[in-house]
């Protein structure tokens, strides 16, 4: 056969310059440059036909490098924005940064030499903090752009911008004028390590905090009920506390009026008052017998007096709230109005003074008597416990592990301490806030319960901070009376100054310049307050400074999207300020995501060595073999693959799987591109009604798949998109349609109906695949679009709009029929595989398939698909092509199957595999009895002979 012709050049093999390898670290930046040069985002944001869609960015903190949590957050936002752009909305995304606050101030202070710290004025410190925040913002901005995130990067919002600070003062002013801002001496979370008040959102509760808890006896001096009189003078009330250092601030004991309390004998003629329900438990704790001598209702004990064991003062037993329970302790609660929220409320009700003998550093003041100078978090507990022991008042000391608030930045414990602070009176607008929560769509729905309970139960919001790097509270104090001056006129004047000069003006200008003219010579002398605002008030004002201020945006925003910790952070501060100022929520929809953990579900930490750096995923690590450069599309694909409503996992194994999936999608697209290299939809497309049945079935699948993809994006369930697209590329395209269609594409005449009909479906599948993956695999989608071998009216995939699905493609009847055919194919493949494994056949084309189908209607359907003459009919809808075999025979008797060496059966078909009849065709590799019958081409079959003449 040495003279045999070569038919290699007559076969239509796929041709494309689209690279098999992603080469993402090089290709992605090229695509990003194309987007930037062509202003794709800007044009769509301006020219799209539908209304505005505003996802308002929660500002990341301008401190430190980007981590995988940033990537999750920003990419989720970008997926939604790009989907909305493809849907035709005018999407305007303004990225923001949170630039004030303690963490930046601490970073700056840590970076200074001791010589630089001397003479460091607030103005100099603020300048350094400003420069640090801007530098970090620039670095983070470049990182976000490399993630492929689209937005107005040239005009971001920064909370340190003068116009932002002025808008923040406007929010504060509106709240103040409505009576929602007040100054008060109240217990707040105080951080001795940072020497400032903290908001709830600035606290964390690490595992494993252990306190020295004590049970203490306070001797009773006078009784409110005669039932107690017989036990005097040896009667005491027992309390329990996990913070012995707060005992110098004790001014009451609180009880629950509904509970029963008993007098118990502890030893001969010594008695304690405790909750009746706890007697047994306390007997174990004290390791002694407690005998009940009398029992009274809590209400009857009100106004019973006791003497403080360490200070010469009398206090009373008072009625507390439902926080007094029998879950722990004694059922009677030590109450220090200067050291606790509930204590403060009880104290206010009974007119108690607010005693808080602790200074900014956490040291006892002279009011603490013998304990003055001791630090409450270090040596005070030991000294107080010793003093209680000496007085015979200590009943028991034991270690107690519980959740305790720490400063989120210094990682050191905080205390409750009463100080003069500025507050937002949440009580004044709580009901309005709860109504506003009801008007919002929460995703997942559990977010609504979370923020509702937080807002329902929260205390007033302490908004003042004793630090330099922030927006000052625009208040003046009368030098003589210390009365605060806060009027519409003073607020507006400061706001106008900040709008031009920024908040630095507060430190740089004199009081006279900061005051409006009418207050400059009114016979009073003023000083300016030096407190700054809580940074949550900064970011919580962004709805006014950005969404409401920029003409291209809108308020309320369509969506806020952040981590689930923001229910107590930005979601809440934004809600409270917007409701207080305007009576409405600042957002219509709130979507929350969980935190990123490693593959074992552990938090990431340097000590565990399990930190996944997005930069390393994109560009590769030092050792590129161990940590190859995957590009950002792999991170974006990961974001779409996880159920973000819970905490999510990432690690090397997960990334490798995602790279495989990205490559499968890429290679599927590459094959489709190559197969369309000579196709022009305008000239060559086949009308739907003329398509072979398998092609119409494939369009039905395309319609099903992409309808599901749209539903996934609409409901923000991106994991459904991920699963659907992955399944479509592998199961529907690669393993089924592409597999079957190769014969049509390769060996038919280039212009034949048989080939053009298939290319018609390929083009539809490819264009819709590119559009569907564009919100997620943005770079791959654009790469595909740029390599389309035919012209489209669209420069970018993002200009082409969302999926193009014709309702006519949906054909349930056809789908049911082909579902059976695909099942049949699976059964045939099982038997083929056995024959292949036994080396009885090599390729499936070496086989002839025997089918016995007992169901008559199915048998009839199959007969229509088993044309004995391959040159008649539509030359596509045939069983031999479905099974990739050379021949198929429908047998009327199962015995024909039973004699076959390779066979199998299911509940609806029996399959036999035998050797194909005839010779192998040199061109298409099918076996045919016609090979050798054509004088000019003796080594090819009748199909190839016809194809070379342009007839097949």
UniProtKB/Swiss-Prot annotation:
It catalyses: tRNA(Ile) + L-isoleucine + ATP = L-isoleucyl-tRNA(Ile) + AMP + diphosphate. InterPro entries: aa-tRNA-synth_I_CS, aa-tRNA-synth_Ia, Anticodon_Ile_BEm, Ile-tRNA-ligase, Ile-tRNA-ligase_type1, Ile-tRNA_ligase, M/V/L/I-tRNA-synth_anticd-bd, Rossmann-like_a/b/a_fold. GO terms for biological process: isoleucyl-tRNA aminoacylation. L-isoleucyl-5'-AMP binds at residue 562. Transmembrane segments: none annotated. Its EC number is 6.1.1.5. Keywords: Aminoacyl-tRNA synthetase, ATP-binding, Cytoplasm, Ligase, Metal-binding, Nucleotide-binding, Protein biosynthesis, Zinc. It is an enzyme of class 6 (ligase). One of its GO terms (molecular function) is ATP binding. CDD domains: Anticodon_Ia_Ile_BEm, IleRS_core. A motif ('KMSKS' region) lies at residues 603-607. It comes from the Bacteria. It is found in: Cytoplasm. GO terms for cellular component: cytoplasm. It holds the Pfam family tRNA-synt_1. Catalyzes the attachment of isoleucine to tRNA(Ile). As IleRS can inadvertently accommodate and process structurally similar amino acids such as valine, to avoid such errors it has two additional distinct tRNA(Ile)-dependent editing activities. One activity is designated as 'pretransfer' editing and involves the hydrolysis of activated Val-AMP. The other activity is designated 'posttransfer' editing and involves deacylation of mischarged Val-tRNA(Ile). HAMAP family: Ile_tRNA_synth_type1 (MF_02002). Belongs to the class-I aminoacyl-tRNA synthetase family. IleS type 1 subfamily. Monomer. NCBIfam families: ileS. This is Isoleucine--tRNA ligase. It comes from Microcystis aeruginosa (strain NIES-843 / IAM M-2473). The lineage of its organism: Bacteria, Bacillati, Cyanobacteriota, Cyanophyceae, Oscillatoriophycideae.
């Amino acid at each position: 056969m040495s003279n045999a012709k070569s038919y290699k050049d007559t076969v239509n093999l796929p041709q494309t310059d689209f690279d098999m390898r992603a080469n993402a670290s090089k290709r992605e930046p090229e695509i990003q440059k194309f987007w930037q040069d062509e202003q794709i985002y800007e044009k769509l944001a301006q020219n799209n036909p539908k209304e505005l869609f505003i996802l308002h960015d929660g500002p990341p903190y301008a401190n430190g490098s980007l981590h995988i949590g940033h990537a999750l957050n920003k990419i989720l936002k970008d997926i939604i924005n790009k989907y909305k752009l493809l849907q035709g909305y005018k999407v305007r995304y303004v990225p923001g940064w949170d630039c004030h606050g303690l963490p930046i101030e601490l970073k700056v202070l840590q970076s200074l030499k001791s010589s630089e710290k001397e003479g460091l004025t607030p103005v100099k410190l603020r300048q350094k903090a400003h420069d640090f925040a801007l530098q970090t913002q620039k670095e983070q901005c470049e990182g976000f752009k490399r993630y492929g995130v689209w937005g107005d990067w040239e005009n971001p919002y920064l909370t340190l911008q003068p116009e932002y600070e002025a808008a923040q003062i406007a929010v504060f002013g509106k709240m103040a004028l409505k009576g929602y801002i007040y100054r008060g001496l109240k217990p707040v979370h105080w951080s001795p390590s940072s020497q400032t008040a903290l908001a709830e959102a600035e606290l964390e509760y690490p595992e494993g905090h252990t306190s020295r808890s004590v049970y203490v006896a306070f001797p009773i001096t006078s009784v409110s009920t005669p039932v107690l009189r017989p036990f005097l003078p040896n009667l005491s009330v027992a309390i329990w506390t996990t913070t012995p250092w707060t005992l110098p601030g004790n001014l009451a004991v609180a009880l629950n009026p509904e509970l029963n309390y008993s007098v118990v004998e502890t030893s001969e003629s010594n008695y304690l008052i405790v909750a009746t329900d706890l007697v047994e438990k306390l007997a174990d704790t004290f390791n002694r017998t407690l005998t009940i001598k009398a029992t009274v209702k809590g209400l009857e004990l009100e106004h019973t007096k006791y003497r403080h064991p360490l200070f010469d003062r009398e206090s009373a037993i008072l009625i507390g709230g439902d926080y007094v329970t029998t879950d722990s302790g004694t059922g009677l609660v030590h109450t220090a109005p200067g050291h606790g929220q509930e204590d403060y409320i009880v104290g206010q009700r009974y007119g108690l003074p607010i005693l808080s003998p602790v200074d900014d550093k956490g040291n006892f003041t002279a009011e603490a008597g013998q304990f003055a100078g001791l630090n409450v978090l270090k040596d005070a507990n030991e000294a107080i416990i010793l003093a209680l022991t000496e007085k015979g008042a200590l009943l028991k000391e034991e270690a107690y592990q519980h959740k305790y608030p720490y400063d989120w930045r210094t990682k050191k414990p905080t205390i409750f301490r009463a100080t003069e602070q500025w507050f937002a009176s949440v009580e004044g607008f709580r009901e309005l806030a709860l109504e506003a929560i009801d008007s919002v769509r929460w995703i997942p729905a559990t977010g609504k319960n979370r923020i509702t309970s937080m807002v329902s139960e929260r205390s007033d919001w302490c908004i003042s901070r004793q630090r330099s790097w922030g927006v000052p509270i625009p208040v003046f104090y009368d030098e003589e009376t210390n009365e605060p001056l806060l009027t519409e006129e003073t607020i507006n004047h400061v706001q106008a100054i900040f709008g031009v000069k920024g908040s630095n003006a507060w430190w740089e200008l004199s009081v006279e310049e900061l005051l409006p003219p009418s207050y400059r010579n009114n016979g009073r002398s003023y000083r300016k307050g030096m407190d700054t605002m809580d940074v949550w008030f900064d970011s919580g004002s962004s709805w006014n400074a950005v969404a409401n201020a920029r003409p291209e945006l809108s308020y309320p925003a369509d969506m806020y999207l952040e981590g689930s910790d923001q229910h107590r952070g930005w979601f809440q501060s934004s809600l409270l300020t917007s409701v207080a100022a305007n009576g409405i929520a600042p957002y219509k929809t709130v979507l929350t995501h969980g935190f990123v953990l490693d593959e074992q579900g552990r938090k990431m930490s340097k000590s565990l060595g399990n930190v996944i750096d997005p930069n390393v995923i994109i560009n590769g690590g030092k050792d590129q073999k161990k940590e190859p450069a995957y590009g950002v599309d792999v991170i974006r694909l990961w974001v779409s693959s996880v159920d973000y409503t819970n905490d999510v996992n990432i690690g090397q194994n997960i990334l490798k799987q995602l790279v495989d999936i990205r490559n499968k999608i890429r290679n599927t697209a590459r094959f489709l591109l190559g197969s369309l290299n000579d196709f022009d939809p305008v000239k060559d497309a086949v009308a739907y009604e003329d398509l072979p049945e398998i092609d119409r079935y494939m369009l039905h699948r395309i319609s099903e798949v992409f309808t599901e993809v749209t539903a996934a994006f609409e409901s923000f369930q991106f994991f459904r998109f991920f699963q659907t697209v992955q399944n479509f590329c592998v199961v529907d395209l690669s393993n089924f349609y592409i597999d079957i269609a190769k014969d049509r594409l390769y060996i038919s005449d280039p212009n034949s109906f048989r080939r053009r009909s298939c290319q018609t479906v390929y083009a539809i599948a490819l264009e819709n695949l590119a559009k569907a993956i564009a919100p997620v695999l943005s770079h791959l989608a654009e790469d595909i679009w740029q390599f389309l071998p035919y012209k489209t009216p669209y420069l970018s995939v993002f200009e082409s709009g969302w999926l193009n699905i014709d309702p006519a493609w949906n054909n349930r009847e056809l789908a049911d029929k082909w579902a059976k055919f695909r099942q049949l194919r699976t059964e045939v493949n099982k038997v083929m595989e056995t024959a292949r494994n036994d080396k009885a056949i090599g390729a499936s084309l070496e086989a002839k398939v025997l089918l016995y189908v007992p169901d008559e209607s199915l048998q009839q359907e199959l007969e229509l698909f088993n044309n004995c003459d391959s040159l008649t009919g539509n030359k596509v809808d045939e069983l031999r092509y479905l099974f990739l075999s050379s021949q198929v025979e429908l047998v009327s008797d199962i015995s024909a199957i039973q004699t076959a060496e390779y066979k199998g059966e299911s509940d609806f078909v029996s399959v036999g595999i035998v050797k194909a009849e005839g010779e192998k065709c040199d061109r298409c590799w099918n076996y045919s009895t016609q090979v050798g019958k054509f004088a000019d081409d003796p080594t090819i079959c009748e199909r190839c002979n016809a194809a070379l003449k342009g007839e097949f």
